[in-house]
Amino acid sequence: MSTIRLTTAQALVKFLNNQYVEFDGKQQRFVKGIFTIFGHGNVLGLGQALEEDPGELEVYQGRNEQGMANAAIAFAKQKNRKQIMAATSSVGPGAANMVTSAATATANNIPVLLLPGDVFATRQPDPVLQQIEHTHDLSISTNDAFRAVSKYWDRVCRPEQLMSAMLNAMRVLTNPADTGAVTIALPQDVQGEAWDFPESFFAKRVHRIERRQPSLESVRDAVKLIRSKKKPLLVLGGGVRYSEAADAFVKFAEKFNIPFAETQAGKGTIESSHPLNLGGIGVTGNLAANTIAKQADLIIGVGTRFTDFTTASKQLFSSAEILTINVSEFHASKLDAVKVVADAKAGLEAIAEALGDYVSAYGNEISEAKQAWNRELERLCSVAYGENFTPEIAGHLDEKLPEYREAFGSELTQTGVIGKVNELIDDDAVIVGASGSLPGDLQRMWVCKDRNTYHMEYGYSCMGYEIAGAFGVKLAEPDKEVYAMVGDGSFLMLHSELVTSLQEGQKINIILFDNSGFGCINNLQMENGMGSFVTEFRKRNLETGQLDGPIMTIDYAKVAEGYGLKTYSVRTMEELETALIDSKKQSISTLIDIKVLPKTMTHGYGSWWHVGVAEVSTKESVQAAYRNKQENLKLARKY
């Protein structure tokens, strides 16, 4: 057996360069590049290997480990999981920063390869800089925290262990049914150790992502169930997008006259204008989808995990039977469903062929539901502040709105701004979101005029994903305009990769909605009987000792200008229109700082969310919220 002598890190780089995926006959390199923040735990091992011979890997310099790993996740998501980025950090805090990203990837079933440096395998210099010492187990390091949030975890304590570790890593990264974060911990001494690796380990490997076919028995079960129902509703999940099954999905819906609703991950797979597309469903869903969902006698979930936001905590369609088509048996088995374990496209096509001349019993309900929602959408886009103004989320901070108006010098509403942005940006532009009130507004209001232009991380709803995610999307779609839709709370959490976008000359656009607070959580607490408590951004009041002083006003445009972005301060609809048009002309990243009044986001449309309301309280409003929760639980599925 012929061998080649390399360090562990050099062998890793060489191996990654020779990994390919094949899907529907198309073959491409799997690992496009690697994000790096070098420290003592990885610079002399993996850093040396990348400097000496990176091969075809593109090497990027991150600014925050979570930020760069989030960018890697967004890249893979936008590439429909067919190509990935890796990310490497040093030991200690750098590695710990990526734990949140690992959880984000795993929650969303998005492949990402994380390569944190680790403490010495030999233990000779222990305790090294940034090492945590556990008196009961010296083998534990910061990197063990990744175990709970990774789909595959390994630690390479000897050079020869790299081979089994990486083959298993590729197994998980290329498995549509069970992909997510893969963490390979690399002790800093082992990275530099040499070994005679078999040359066969570095041969070109093609990992075929095959379309799992459904069993004949499961197809028969599905057909029997559908034929027994009059008003089925399809739920379009992210699996349809990742399977690249949009055309098959549309064909299925049209052939059998079955309307469909979208999850956050599924939205944008098919244009919003399709006559059977009801839009977002569930807690952040709209009036049309939730109305039809309550009438449906069968829910057909395709490529969806059926999270609580999709099912409205299992209350939205509690009496309907459930059919699932999912490549993951785990997800297919949810809600005690009749399950078809298969690739989305393969499953839909097999069922369609066997279903024959079935047609649903829907009449005008679908078009009427869409028309009603379109009227509501027009109203939301035209909401403007004025005399006797009532916000969408009424009864919370109504009396404080004049104070916000004066502090901001703005009367803009969040729904009005979203409508204008949707109107003016390019049809093929990609929007990116993750947290706060914006995911609800966008799932309800955003009209996708082109496919794959809606990129929402809502499996983990990671604050700080938006800007790093926009950068990752831009690397995946360099010819498109990309917009991060972000609130002020999330911007403050993490915006480090703005600098990386400037460094790389990859323009992204930040649409910053500043309502000076954690608005959606303020809604949640006040809707459940609490007051406004530590969710508005207010200064400490020396008289009360509470955070109920003056509203904090931050010039985010100045912050971004300091980094080198082209920025705009927006207080009127005219200024917004000018900024959106001018930002398209720029060649560098832009930020539009928009002051919007609180409580002007959308409200729920016939849905309920099960949250942990206090059972005991001195406040009648909290007691009422608890009673309401208990009443809604009676209407929900138990499992």
UniProtKB/Swiss-Prot annotation:
Pathway: Polyol metabolism; myo-inositol degradation into acetyl-CoA; acetyl-CoA from myo-inositol: step 3/7. Pfam families: TPP_enzyme_C (PF02775), TPP_enzyme_M (PF00205), TPP_enzyme_N (PF02776). It catalyses: 3D-3,5/4-trihydroxycyclohexane-1,2-dione + H2O = 5-deoxy-D-glucuronate + H(+). This is 3D-(3,5/4)-trihydroxycyclohexane-1,2-dione hydrolase. GO terms for cellular component: acetolactate synthase complex. The keyword Hydrolase applies. The gene is iolD. One of its GO terms (molecular function) is magnesium ion binding. Binds 1 Mg(2+) ion per subunit. Its EC number is 3.7.1.22. The keyword Zinc does not apply. Involved in the cleavage of the C1-C2 bond of 3D-(3,5/4)-trihydroxycyclohexane-1,2-dione (THcHDO) to yield 5-deoxy-glucuronate (5DG). Its cofactor is Mg(2+); thiamine diphosphate. InterPro entries: DHS-like_NAD/FAD-binding_dom (IPR029035), Myo_inos_IolD (IPR030817), THcHDO_hydrolase_firmi (IPR023757), THDP-binding (IPR029061), Thiamin_PyroP_enz_cen_dom (IPR012000), Thiamin_PyroP_enz_TPP-bd_dom (IPR012001), TPP-bd_CS (IPR000399), TPP_enz (IPR045229). Residues 437-517 are annotated as: Thiamine pyrophosphate binding. Thiamine diphosphate binds at E65.
